[in-house]
Amino acid sequence: MTYCIGMRLNQGLVFLSDSRTNAGVDQVGTFRKMSVFENPGERMLVLMTAGNLSISQAIRQIVAEHIDSNGLSIWNVASMYDAARIVGEAVRTVHQREAKALADCGIDFNVSIIVGGQIGAERCRLFQVYSAGNFIESHDETTYFQIGEAKYGKPIIDRVITPASTLDEAAKCALISMDSTLKSNISVGLPLDLLVYEAGSLAVTRFVTIDEKNRYFRMIRDTWGEQLKSVFENMDNPVWDVAPGTDGRSLASCSTAGKPVRMTMPAQLGNTAQPTTPMQSLAQQVHNGRQH
């Protein structure tokens, strides 16, 4: 499995991917999921993939090399929309070629793609491409896309990231999101590829491969866990024995719906409730047993 995230901000774009693939606990490998298509001063595009590795690699190769009947390729299209369309066509090409053989072996055609970047004077744009080759574009209401194991790292992004977030803030948030995923899912793993793109530069602004020795990421992992525990411990525990509305910590409900749903025992079973007896300590149970 894998986890990749792309963010579109007013200042530019941030991309982060892991590099783990696995086909079982004893078949774990490292394959980089991020590819860069760059012609400095003219265009800079990033493609990240999740899903079946052979499908992903085939799509990436077609995107890099294919020129259509109109002479268009990822290297010369005039807009990011057309770039996303070329990626979608590559997905369909691989599907047409491989899907039946995969299905005959019981393997689904499974791939998800994030592609984003900037071409010429056009604004930065970010797309997610699906297994059918169709795609959607991010907007201010949805400033990021995730593929792969997305659920663990989603909450922090939803709470923190807006179009006005800085590139450094977004990079930090992406790393925290990845740390949450690494903590909860062993199918995602180091090293990570982090790329930061500043709008208008038309070249990679910053790039780093992060392994277990990276001091900043180690600080993120330690500090984030400690701060979460600190915030949790400093929050008040719920209060149960006060009237509703008299204390902000009260969990008591004013609503009559605040009761459990109790099921009715079938009448033919009668009353089988056992009489309650005081709880005994283990020592008392042993002592009572010796009296028999």
PLM region spans:
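N-terminal nucleophile
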Residues: 1-292
